[in-house]
């Protein structure tokens, strides 16, 4: 069943939940049923979504009968965990009776291969919208979760996202990632702009936001661990300085402006330090800066070029790129700069390391033929795995907060894409596409204000 054994018991709990970040109230019934989405044997979870029915005979906004299930299907599909069954030819669901509480035809849904069913309904009064969602376990023939959301019509997308996050939490034990954004740079000729896009933007095509612009280059966006700031390098004043800005675009401030190259690496897990690549003392070396005081301390000392530093999740080690061996390779050192050791030996060009938030693995890009591909390697140097394939340049990997997905940029055929990769199944989806050059994607932490 889904390639793994499903939980045998279901503990039903009744609770009332108030959504602090949302203008509607939730009532829920939920149970613990975990499916191992990290198993090599994992198969997508077969799920069906029924048309939604008007509640209590409310016939207003009939288009929502198809809008809600369509949005639920798109949102489930974005996770990469579900096999959404085509409802064509499926059983006549509760929308034919007008009673959202009616029992689904479990046997008929099961004959279509469904293991779970989502059904629901809606009603409206003036500008207020009420939506119900229910998750049914078809195999066990019982309801696992029921939620009701109340808000404005502009909140219906957020209602769908919040419910799917609850489904993910219940079935997989994960938190989901719709409350995250991905920052990336768009180049148009000589000018550049920094943008963010919400992970759920494909649901209805919205949620792309411009953060900052420059008539020259912007490089290396980096999220602070609390999601309040983006650090990046820009040539807006004639040389590569480091700036910080809020994701809304306010509070732009220059924080590093040494002579020569200034590039941000990564914020420390506690947000107190920022790794840097500076050339103020000659060649490019790795430094760490105290964010409050602005004081910097040098970590590497050699004649090579050292760039792209990132922290381990516990803040005790740093991965970076150095050409000290003659070609760019990934190295690891202690947070104080000691105990440097080479990590990658396969390939003659490996760069842009990204340490998984779960620990254990580092993603990076490596040159293969005339293009670049994304790889992962265990933090001890073993188990090298190529994660992408195909023509073009696959670059700038960045992990999702749960460490199960990667975002990266792909340049191929005159188009640029910001893609999402499932690190287990290797399934790839496109989040954003343009004829302009898109690069340097950076995945945010979970954002408290994310459900917009």
From Swiss-Prot:
Pfam families: PD40, TolB_N. One of its GO terms (biological process) is protein import. Residues 1-31 form the signal peptide. The Tol-Pal system is composed of five core proteins: the inner membrane proteins TolA, TolQ and TolR, the periplasmic protein TolB and the outer membrane protein Pal. They form a network linking the inner and outer membranes and the peptidoglycan layer. Belongs to the TolB family. Part of the Tol-Pal system, which plays a role in outer membrane invagination during cell division and is important for maintaining outer membrane integrity. This is Tol-Pal system protein TolB. It comes from Syntrophus aciditrophicus (strain SB). The gene is tolB.
């Amino acid at each position: 069943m889904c390639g793994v054994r499903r939980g045998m018991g279901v503990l039903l709990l009744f609770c009332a939940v108030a959504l602090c970040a949302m203008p509607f109230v939730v009532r829920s019934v939920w149970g613990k049923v975990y499916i191992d989405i990290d198993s090599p044997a994992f198969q997508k979870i077969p799920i069906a979504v029924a048309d939604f029915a008007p509640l209590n005979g409310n016939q207003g906004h009939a288009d929502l009968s198809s809008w809600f299930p369509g949005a639920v299907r798109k949102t489930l599909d974005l996770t990469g965990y579900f096999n959404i069954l085509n409802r064509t030819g499926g059983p006549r669901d509760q929308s034919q009776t007008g009673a959202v509480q009616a029992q689904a035809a479990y046997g008929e849904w099961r004959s279509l291969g469904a293991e779970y069913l989502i059904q629901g309904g809606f009603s409206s009064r003036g500008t207020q919208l009420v939506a119900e969602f229910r998750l049914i376990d078809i195999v066990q023939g019982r309801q696992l979760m029921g939620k009701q959301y109340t808000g404005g019509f502009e909140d219906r997308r957020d209602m769908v996202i919040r419910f799917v996050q609850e489904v993910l939490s219940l079935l997989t034990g994960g938190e989901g990632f719709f409350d995250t954004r991905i920052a990336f740079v768009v180049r148009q000729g000589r000018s550049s702009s920094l943008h963010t896009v919400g992970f759920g933007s494909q649901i209805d095509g919205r949620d792309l936001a411009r953060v900052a612009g420059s008539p020259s280059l912007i490089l290396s966006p980096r999220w602070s661990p609390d999601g309040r700031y983006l650090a990046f390098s820009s040539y807006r004043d004639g040389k590569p300085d480091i700036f910080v800005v809020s994701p809304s675009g306010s509070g732009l401030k220059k924080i590093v402006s040494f002579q020569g190259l200034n590039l941000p690496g990564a914020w420390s897990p506690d947000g107190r330090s920022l790794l840097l690549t500076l050339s103020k003392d000659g060649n490019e070396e790795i430094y760490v800066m105290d964010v409050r005081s602005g004081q910097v301390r040098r970590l590497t000392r050699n004649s090579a070029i050292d760039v792209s530093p990132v922290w381990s999740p516990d803040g005790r080690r740093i991965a970076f790129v150095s050409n000290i061996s003659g070609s760019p390779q990934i190295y690891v050192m202690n947070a104080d700069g000691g105990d440097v050791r080479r990590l990658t030996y396969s390939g003659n060009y490996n760069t842009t390391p990204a340490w998984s938030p779960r620990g254990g693995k580092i993603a990076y890009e490596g040159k293969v033929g005339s293009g670049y591909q994304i790889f992962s390697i265990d933090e001890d140097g073993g188990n090298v795995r190529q994660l992408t394939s195909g023509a073009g340049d696959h670059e700038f990997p960045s992990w999702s907060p749960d460490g199960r997905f990667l975002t990266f940029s792909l340049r191929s055929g005159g188009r640029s894409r910001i893609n999402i990769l499932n690190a287990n199944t290797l399934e790839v989806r496109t989040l954003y596409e343009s004829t302009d050059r898109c690069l340097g994607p950076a995945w945010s932490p979970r954002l408290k204000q994310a459900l917009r």
